[in-house]
């Protein structure tokens, strides 16, 4: 397993969050079937996820940097 920032595969951006620490949105996104993590929380205004499978992409994506085309 690995830890990392969740990443939007279509934009290459992190999942933004504003409620730091325990965060329902991040936890839900982290545990979603397509991510497969064990616990998510908000760190530095982005969703950090623990216990991700190695197959799940995390920020930064190799071919996409957020905000650049």
Curated annotation (Swiss-Prot):
It is found in: Secreted. The keyword Kinase does not apply. Transmembrane segments: none annotated. Expressed by the venom gland. CDD domains: neurotoxins_LC_scorpion (cd23106). It holds the Pfam family Toxin_3. Residues 2-67 form the LCN-type CS-alpha/beta domain. The modification Cysteine amide is found at residue 66. SUPFAM superfamilies: Scorpion toxin-like. One of its GO terms (biological process) is defense response. Disulfide bonds join 13-66, 17-42, 26-47, 30-49. GO terms for cellular component: extracellular region. Its main location: secreted. Residues 67-69 form a propeptide. Keywords: Amidation, Disulfide bond, Ion channel impairing toxin, Neurotoxin, Secreted, Signal, Toxin, Voltage-gated sodium channel impairing toxin. Residues 1 form the signal peptide. One of its GO terms (molecular function) is sodium channel inhibitor activity. Belongs to the long (4 C-C) scorpion toxin superfamily. Sodium channel inhibitor family. Beta subfamily. Beta toxins bind voltage-independently at site-4 of sodium channels (Nav) and shift the voltage of activation toward more negative potentials thereby affecting sodium channel activation and promoting spontaneous and repetitive firing. Has the structural arrangement of an alpha-helix connected to antiparallel beta-sheets by disulfide bonds (CS-alpha/beta). This is Neurotoxin Cex3. It comes from Centruroides exilicauda.
